[in-house]
Amino acid sequence: MIRVLLKGPVLSKSGYGEHSRFVYRSLKQKPDKFDVFVYPTEWGKSSWILNENPETNQINLDILRTRNLLESGAQNTVEKPLFDVSLQVTIPNEFEFSARTNIGVTAGIETDRVSPEWIQKTNETQGLIVVSHHAKNGFEKTTYDASKGEEKFTLKTTVPIDVVGYPVKKLEPSSEVNSLAFDTKFNFLSICQWGPRKNVTATLRGFIEEFMDDADTGLILKTHRINNSLSDRWSLKADIDNVLAQYPNRKCKIYYLHGNMTEAELHTLYTHSDIHAYVTTTHGEGYGLPIFEAAYSGLPVIAPSWSGHVDFLYMPRETKTKNKKNLREAMFEKVKYEIAQVAPEAVWETVINADSQWCYVEPKSLKKSMRVVKQNYIAKKRKAEKLQKYLIEKYDCNKMYQKIQDSVVKLHENNLSTIVANLNKNVTHHVVGSLATASVRKEK
């Protein structure tokens, strides 16, 4: 059995929180193979899951078990480490090392490259698990000129990288959300954090300008800035009102949703009878979980064809020509875009570099795409349902859990083989971090 320390925001209402719980579920599915310990972390100022359910109760029990172990005074040595594997679900510059095999789990970045700090920390792990090929490419294709003393070298990612996307979920609809009444006959939905990375104001402006005189069309915006607090709600409403004030004669409607919602409640938005399509003007996604949830729920999606979400918005093209293999068909309404440097307010030290680039949607293309989906809804819905069927099969939860399990086992076994080989070569191996620092050297 492999003793695993899972470190991440496992009780946070955030993308990384959901990522942590996905990894947790994957490992807990095989109790005969993985002995799971949990070290919870925060994710910024995001809200925590407060409602009790069987999963959160089990997570809390595993957290308590971990705390008891760490407070027991047990020593962490190479000969007998506390943990065989650590899985750290976070951004790479926060990776720490506390097991024999240390695996990073990250959503990557919205931009076209990762920072040198990310590469340095990633190379200290024994492997990386990312959620999309965009994230993988960001690590594998980014290089920097570096030096150590007089030695010059190319800094690049050298550890193996596995891609494991999220699984689909089957949740019972919320009767409370289904009872929400919208005055408009056709409604778009967008779910995201309000900030420069998600480019929400472009969604808002594009919608209003396209449907300015259409009283039967609405945009449902589920958003937050930092968390689900009342202060966040009212400060964000002021920002939305400032945008709306610039369109005093608009007839289209904006529905602003804010606050704690369960997973079932959120998923019910995607299947609500009065919600017809999902729209995003994101600058980029490591994966794009709300976009994925909308797609596997059968909603037509309007999005730029760039970054993590393209993994699941395309499907194999049906063709009778044998030579045309690996052709993919876009199953969403594509918005034209350009790749350009990130805005100064989006720069995040050690995470988003000032010279990074991401996508900017073309406003005219966004408006046209929304109009096309509304005017050709039957055909667009049929296409979305075809994609839905494909995603439900490809991203079945048991298949994705198995991929996490296989990746952890593979990376751990590869590392053990490397340790043995290094011992035979008289090379020191380190277990470093907050738990202990140890080294092994072959005796002569």
Protein language model regions, located:
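Nucleotide-activated donor-binding/catalytic signature segment of Leloir-type glycosyltransferases, i.e.
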Residues: 229-269, 275-276
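N-terminal pre-catalytic "stem/leader" segment of glycosyltransferase-like enzymes
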Residues: 1-81, 218, 402
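Short hydrophobic beta-strand element within catalytic cores of glycosyltransferases
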Residues: 300-303, 314, 320-324, 333
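C-terminal amphipathic helix plus adjacent low-complexity
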Residues: 225, 335-444
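Donor nucleotide-sugar binding/catalytic pocket of nucleotide-sugar-dependent glycosyltransferases
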Residues: 127-173, 418
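Acidic donor-binding loop of glycosyltransferase active sites
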Residues: 268-286, 296-299
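Extended catalytic core of nucleotide-activated donor transferases of GT-like folds
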Residues: 5-7, 46-140
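Conserved donor-binding/catalytic core segment of Leloir-type glycosyltransferases
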Residues: 5, 180-198, 204-207, 219-221
